[in-house]
Amino acid sequence: MTSNPIFTSMRSIAVAAAALVWLAGGAEAQTKVAVITPYLAQPGTQFYVEGFQAAAKDKGWDVNVIDTKGDVAAVISRIEDVVNQKVNAIVINVDPSQVKAGLQAAKDAKIPVFGMDSGTDPLLVTNVTSNGYAMAAETAVYVANRISGAGNVVMFVFDAFPPVQVRGHIADAVFSNFPDIKVLQRVTPDVADGGIVDSRAKMEAILAANPTPGSIKAVWAAWDQPALGALQAIEAAGRGKEGIVITGIDANPQARDAIAAGGSFEASVAQDFQGIGSTAADAVARVLAGQTIKQSVIYVPTKLVTQANAAEKK
């Protein structure tokens, strides 16, 4: 039997149309997320960005990591850039109060913004981080106990970044509760290169100004890079056997190695960087799926690291 050419043509059109509908439904647009930070030179930042990327890869997202290389002001224009690119979400690692214009641009475009070890702000959905209050208290109390509540302490701080500012503030409070502990100097290092080099230089100057053995009992650092710089300065000055106690926060691989070696660098607090990154990715996924996050801060657990456990696998 001869087929009807008109019927055949109509059937072909119908099949083609159905195929197009199926393709349109099956090929959903890939979720695009921008991660913006001026602090990628810091090991901690590198680790939780990697954690975010790993979690995002499992979710099939397209992640664009933007490093403004220490330029906080540039974060605003980078946020505006990705808003114009119509990303689905933005993750920042910077003080949100310093990039308000960018956050407002994202809000106006209805693009959710998340903090990853940043700080809290009404324009952020939430901030995923470690509990800086607890970490600082733990290391400051460690220092106070190790020096028997007396002596000069050098502090390395960085008040321009909220998660680190909190640590310094809490350590100040702990030390002020010990009448015989004196904060000899509160140092803010240049972090453009990561912080080790300038911290070493500043510690060398402090050591030179305080040459008497025992004149410096401890160095409390709000993160590991200054602690490592201080360690280098102390060892280079031949004062490694003096018993100066050094503590940091982050427990990055270099710090763990130094702690395991049993020298002046005695303790740090291990942040779960991969956990911060993956938890931030989960928060993004929940919001993009239509869920609401009530917490302004989501804390990821930490652990004190000393020589006893420094070699343990994280």
Give names to the regions the model predicted.
Residues 2-14:
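Bacterial N-terminal signal peptides that target proteins for export
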Residues 3-6, 22, 27-314:
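A residue-level marker of the well-folded mature domains of exported/periplasmic proteins
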Residues 13-24:
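Bacterial N-terminal signal peptides
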